[in-house]
Amino acid sequence: MLGMDRSLGIDLGTVSVLIYQKGKGIVLQEPSVVSILRDSGKVLAVGEEAKNMLGKTPGNIIAIQPMKSGVIADYEITEKMLSYFIRKVCGDSKVFRPQVVICVPSGGTEVEKRAVLEATMQAGARKAYLIEEPIAAAIGAGLDISEPYGNMIVNVGGGTSDIAVISLGGIVVSESLRVAGNNFDEDIIKYIKEKYSLMIGEKSAETLKIEIGTAMELKEELFADIRGRDLVSGLPKSISVGSNEILEAISNSLKTIIEGIKIVMEKIPPELAADIADKGIIITGGGGLLRNFDQLLSKITGVPAYLAEKPISCVALGAGKVLDNIHVLKSGLISMYK
């Protein structure tokens, strides 16, 4: 136990938290959800157990998602959640506290970044460093970002979409959007409610997105059955929904992400544009798993787009790889506040 390296790379996401432990790889992946007692604020459950309570809790229990659009919405609950996950990975020792590299969206303000660092320190870190998500995602996707060549990353998470061109270890141009996978779910809920007068929950919307969601119209449409509450009768009801309906539902959110990608591409310096055209766009993040999202990007931009090998884990893996080369702090790859 004394010889264990407690260095951690943390992807503190809106939807889930992933933790990389040096020498072990990804050791934790759990939802960013905390259940508390309304009156006392006592934490009842964290992660998967708390997520299972979403929408099902009695009046005295609240299930909270403390991260919104990639930033801390509830500082105290975020700190408790981080503390729980760090203890789960490293144990309760107050002597051997971990060194942590934690990821933040590229568009975060200094106040938002400071909040993440302070929450990480309060949660039990010995030292805390920041790395911007596109850089972590690029490293985690296996790109060599230290070379004088352009690499383009589109990281579509749960709460934010980060689009960036990276060269010589830093971000040359970027755009951070607070539109991502969660917005797809919200779009689907709204669409089903308006078209079918049926109320469905977040889990049901996510299931539809995963099973039949698509970024481009399919030649052979997919269908899925979904259950919800009929807003007219108040009774449970089941309907069949098609993939092209899901595309219609999420089209505005998709358009926002595509516009963000276009903005970045218009700002790419000419000397790096040829690199992007040659190597293509790398897609990371859970939102990038949307069916045909890579094909849509290729069609719109005229540049090949590829889904990373482990899109959901890329950010945490990148933070972990930085742990193995922590000396890169000196080159400014990571902002160190504490």
What are these regions (language model features)?
Residues 1-156, 164-282, 288-338:
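Nucleotide/phosphate-binding catalytic cleft detector across ATP-hydrolyzing
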